[in-house]
Amino acid sequence: HMRAEYKTPTGLPDSSAVDLMAELVESQNEIVIRDSMILCAFAKGVTSNEVMVEAYNSITGQSTNWSELKSRAAEQWDLARAWNVSYWQRLGHNPKQQDLLSYRLRKDPLPDGIAKGMVGFVDDEDERFCIEEYYRLRGWTVNGILS
């Protein structure tokens, strides 16, 4: 469930996605809220933010708002990241290396379909820029570790 998607279709990936990293982070945080409330992943967008806040406040007895829920979701994402980083380091793996898409998604063009001939990023530099921007937005170090 620790995934995200873009809120609106972005079209075929024929240009850098670096400008979409902020939307990706926001989407991930919203998915954490939805998953924490045990809402169906396939019903994304059906339950409004206001209803989720009202439900949260009713269940917990707290008085919070959507912005605070998103902040808590970011903390939850960071906790999951911290666990992953610790695990990877115990195995001797570099966290930044673990964030790369598989070789196949990065280098092997799709053989058919609407995105025929495309790969995950425009090029290696684009992939690096996207990862660096994602880390920056999350407040992590350049190596993908919580700061």
Which residues make up each language-model segment?
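Extended C-terminal regions of large enzymes
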Residues: 1-147
